[in-house]
Amino acid sequence: MGGLPTEATIAHVLVSKYADHLPLYRQSQILARAGLDLHRAVLADWVGKAAFHLKPVVDRLTDHLKRSSKLFMDETTAPVLDPGRGKTKTGYLWALARDDRPWGGEDPPGVVYFYAPGRAGQNAETFLTGFDGILQIDGYQGYNRLTKPTRKGGNPIRVAHCWAHARRKLNEVFDRDRSEIAAEGLRRIAGIYAVEADIRGISPGQRLSARQTHSAPLVAAFGDWLQAERRKVSAKSRLGEKLTYIHNHWDGLQTFLADGRVEIDNNRVENMIRPIALNRKNSLFAGHDEGGIAWGRIASLIETCKINGVEPFAYLKATLTAIANGHPQNHIEYLLPWNFKPSS
């Protein structure tokens, strides 16, 4: 097959790989059945070039998110081929997300995935340069450096920890040991979540008032219960380890009580990590670190399209066409997914 691919063809390859999780070798096989001889190396080259040209759009999306008052962050593995060894190494994709819909925020939701060759906390510190808001995270210790006065790239960040992770820790013990203490902890956490179900979608001020009235006493009682139970069990036991985990994150678990914009858990960004896991399962690994970077960039635009109700193929086709036609760099904002207007 000679000639250059159209923007529609490239968009189709990108959406097939990163939205439909169809590996390039399978796309090549499907095209071959239609009489089109396109080796997966050719498709990979298209993906890399598309990611290069889409970089300014992803950079602008990143800047937009970093201006937010509150963001979510989570990370997941992204296996990458290590050319020097002929084996795979473990890279990571870090998701930085905004979703203010639960409290009626006006900024559109979005997510950016950053690739790094490791999980070190300095990667999160680098990605978050310029962000000084509240960060909702899980209990990974690598984030601790973000809260210190020595943080590079901004002021110390205030963190909000995840009650879903606390619940998960207790659930692990209950499922394995049928611990009555774990069961009691789960009942108490369910009461805190019941308040959240009642206040979803109302204003931050209303959420804060309801939490101060209803949630704060429940959280305080949970804290007293937690300390009492920790004194009863060995810190080295399975239950003791889970209770210690909750204790170590106690300050961050209370952040939601003081700010109606903060969620009770990190589930929003965890949902945005799932497409990465699906792609990892089907494609097994990226070809190199640059492939991991391309994966992050394209997934950023596709997933931001999806959470804004924008059709990814139409968006990518139009955006690649605009870039090919010389879209001005000082108007990149118009190419963000939530500004896309499909042609009639």
Write out the residue ranges for each language-model feature.
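Catalytic center-proximal scaffold of phosphoryl-transfer enzymes
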Residues: 1-344
